């Protein structure tokens, strides 16, 4: 809920994929790991922070997207459980959209006194890769042939993650 390393984490999604693999968008969605965190626990127990402008941004999103990440739910996980669900195999690359995810996840790991989910040098920025590698790239996005962008539910962690993989693997 902000752009600081101490920000509350609402939710996260990870999709393990083989860079040489062939996947449909739906297959990527189906293999995603989704974690919804308990925001109140983070504020109460770890003094994590909330930015007012981020709350205002969330309030402008669709009801469905807010129900997935922003609203309290029955699937909210403790910070400790959520972090463990995000922990990956050693020497696996994590692609993220910018550096914020790494900062906040590493920070909450410090709060929990557990190791980061992966080494700092295993993180990669998907926007930079797309901008450098794809001819149609613009600000970290590119065209994906035979893919309907309308299928992406913007700001839904799993959909955003799957779309990033689609652009990285199949973008032009």
What are these regions (language model features)?
Residues 1, 5-9, 15, 77, ...:
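Metal-dependent nucleotidyl/phosphoryl-transfer cores and adjacent nucleic-acid-binding surfaces
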Residues 1-96:
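Conserved non-catalytic scaffold segment of RNase H-like nuclease domains
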Residues 38-46, 52-56, 124-163:
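Active-site-proximal helix-loop-helix substrate-binding element of RNase H-like nuclease domains
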Residues 81, 85, 103, 107, ...:
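Residue-level signal for well-ordered alpha-helical scaffold segments within enzymatic catalytic domains
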Residues 87, 100-121:
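Substrate-recognition/cap helix-loop segment adjacent to the acidic, metal-dependent catalytic center
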Residues 90-99, 103-104, 141-172:
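Acidic, Mg2+-coordinating catalytic module of metal-dependent nucleases/exonucleases
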Residues 97, 110, 129:
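Short, loop-centered acidic/histidine patches that primarily coordinate divalent metals
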């Amino acid at each position: 809920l902000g752009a600081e390393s101490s920000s509350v984490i609402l939710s996260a999604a990870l999709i393990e994929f083989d860079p040489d693999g062939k996947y449909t968008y739906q297959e990527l969605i189906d293999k995603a790991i989704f974690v919804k965190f308990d925001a109140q626990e983070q504020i109460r127990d770890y003094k994590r922070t909330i930015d007012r402008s981020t709350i205002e941004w969330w309030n402008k999103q669709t009801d469905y997207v807010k129900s997935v990440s922003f609203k309290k739910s029955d699937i909210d996980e403790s910070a400790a459980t959520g972090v463990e669900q995000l922990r990956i195999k050693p020497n696996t690359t994590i692609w993220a959209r910018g550096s914020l995810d790494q900062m906040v996840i590493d920070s909450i790991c410090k709060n929990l006194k557990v190791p980061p989910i992966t080494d700092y040098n295993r993180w990669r920025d998907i926007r930079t890769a797309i901008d450098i590698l794809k001819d149609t790239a613009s600000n970290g996005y590119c065209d994906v042939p035979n893919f309907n962008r309308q299928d992406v539910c913007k700001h839904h962690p799993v959909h955003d993650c799957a779309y990033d993989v689609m652009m990285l693997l199949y973008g032009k």
